[in-house]
Amino acid sequence: VLSPADKTNVKATWDKIGGHAGEYGGEALERTFTAFPTTKTYFPHFDLSHGSAQVKAHGKKVADALTTAVAHMDDLPGALSALSDLHAHKLRVDPVNFKLLSHCLLVTLACHHPADFTPAVHASLDKFFSAVSTVLTSKYR
């Protein structure tokens, strides 16, 4: 459960990210494919090379979904219901991949905003990404 302090940290961090969210989403997705090659199996139709326009575009979709989640932290299940259905029923993404991408998102944000990435902010973002992952995998059961 996200505390009021967690929500404040997440919103403040997302505000600082601003227009870079799509760029960071693409970078985190590319990092995920590099660090965890098994995640590539869900994207056989993508050019997965460094700097790929397809990876960047999908990373922007990830970032846009997270921006929606930040705006609706008090109702993540409602805000992410359609994405949960898509990933559970149509795409059948292995739930572990959300944890892997979350880790790569944390690394990417820490690289770009080291001064802002305090232990408290790290913990809040980790809890937030975990909450988003839980919602996205909730319809698997």
From Swiss-Prot:
Tell me where in this chain the PTM Phosphotyrosine is found: Y24
| Name the UniProt record assigns to this protein | Hemoglobin subunit alpha
Encoding gene per record: HBA
UniProt keyword Nuclease present: no
The residues that hold heme b are H87
Keyword Nucleus tagged? no
Q: Where is the Globin domain?
A: 1-141
Do you know which InterPro entries this protein is assigned to? Globin (IPR000971), Globin-like_sf (IPR009050), Globin/Proto (IPR012292), Hemoglobin_a-typ (IPR002338), Hemoglobin_oxygen_transport (IPR050056), Hemoglobin_pi (IPR002339)
Kindly state the subunit structure of this protein: Heterotetramer of two alpha chains and two beta chains.
Q: Which GO MF term does the entry hold, naming one?
A: organic acid binding
The UniProt similarity line reads: Belongs to the globin family.
Modified positions (Phosphoserine) in chain numbering? S3, S49, S102, S124, S138
